[in-house]
Amino acid sequence: MVYSTSTSGMNSSGIMFTLILTALPLIGFGQDNELESIETSVIKIYTTLAAPDYFTPWRLLTPRQSSGSGSVIQGNQILTNAHVIANASYVQAQKHNDPQRYQARVTFVSHEADLAIITVDDPSFFQDLKPLSIGLLPEPLQEVSVYGYPIGGKSLSITKGILSRVEQQVYAHAGSYLLAGQIDAAINPGNSGGPVIMNNEIVGVVMQASSGGRAENLGYFVPPSIIRHVLEDSADGANDGFPDLGFRTQALDSPAAKAAYGLKNGQNGVLVIKVFDDSPAAGKFEENDVILSIDEYEIAEDGTIKLSEDLLTDYKHAIDMHHIGEEILVHYSRAGKEGSINLKAEKARDNYSLVKGEQFDRTPQYYIYGGILFVPLNMNLIKRWGSDWARSAPVSLLKMRNEWSSPERQEVVVALQVLAGDVNLGYHDWRNWVVESVNGKQVKDFQQFANLLKQNLEDNVVFENKNGYQMVINHDKAMESESTILSQYRIPAAHSAELFSN
């Protein structure tokens, strides 16, 4: 992702958290009208970010300033990246060649697609600004131009690149797996959210860069199909997002496996390895079914579909292009017998995995009991270990990312740290400890865990992990010591505000 801060880092797939497009300063003489029209439609965005601290969830991290880019689109809207305005407490917009900054506000965010829409209420801001339209995805090897405000100067800059690849990529901002375009351009912080232009139309929104390994000068952008999906989703103001049918698959490129699951010669597809309860696929698909096609797209043995003669991508894209509530036709094979079924597209749930994805613009949950800080495990917490979190975060927590949820267990609860006091003597050095049960009752999720503590009638509360190790807290002493511990550690409340709101 690319905004003007020093918070670059790498995720486990090697994608940098800063996107950087080489800036070629624009010379302000002899520009034709079309170029000038594009220039005036590219906006610099200033933000003050105040993200919560997931190590001490009652506090905010030190506020910091950052900047990114955006472009004016229809309806007095400015299109940018979600990561440019995520956790923002204050947003401003500045026009090309105009020193004035205007207060802006966020009207819609899709963290999944790393896209956001902001606007400026001052009507004078949009005067003489021509909205840019959304174009079509360029063909491979076509040249595109990227506009934005990278660091190193205050004026608008431009870079050119060649579209080299279009395929599903992990979006670094929120970890989504969506279609993305790749261009061969070096990059600099500040271009995040800037438009990728061809034929005077937006054909992408700059979002991230590849770093590490041998790949150099590679930038990624959100393609037109994803942009249109988000804009259509924003029409009613409700963020429905992208659908998830509730099953997981693996490639089926082994001839022996194809024969074992009853595929005929020439048939291809992907093997269903997991069907989640209470999902659109529940009761309709079974493990070891083979998904042959989605709508009109036949699925190859490696899990790809053919979008055009020159474009293969993951079959998930055929699902992504639907909106919530639409019907999706799925053709499948079960033990050699073929069938078709329409599944209703439902909003992706965040609890298919035991570890929820990174969340933004939210207050973290926590509960302090007996001086022990308990929190739900999510990617926000894991990433708090720094840009090298895949190596520096506790292995016991990282392993949880590979586990599916179940009706009995939908979330992981962690005893993050012990706030030392008489009530928790013997446990002062315990930290990052996964709680499996409370007084013999399995932990389902953080809300149920908190309710077990709040409603406890036993003399002692016994926390146990999967290996049988126990942490025992006397309930009366926990209640008596609560105000003292909160005062000593300057903590405003024993739990997050919304935990018991219902």
Locate predicted features.
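C-terminal recognition in membrane/secretory proteostasis and scaffolding
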Residues: 48, 59, 74, 82, ...
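Short beta->alpha transition motifs characteristic of CBS
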Residues: 67, 81-86, 148, 164-165, ...
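Conserved active-site neighborhood of the chymotrypsin/trypsin-like protease fold
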Residues: 74-156, 189, 339-340
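A conserved glycine-rich beta-strand in the N-terminal activation segment of trypsin-fold
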Residues: 32, 52-75, 81, 100-103, ...
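Active-site region of chymotrypsin-like
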Residues: 41-47, 52-53, 59, 121-131, ...
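N-terminal secretory signal peptides that target proteins for export/translocation
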Residues: 1-12
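Bacterial N-terminal signal peptides
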Residues: 14-25
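Short, conserved beta-turn/loop elements at beta-strand boundaries and strand-helix junctions
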Residues: 50, 109-113, 164-172, 252-254, ...
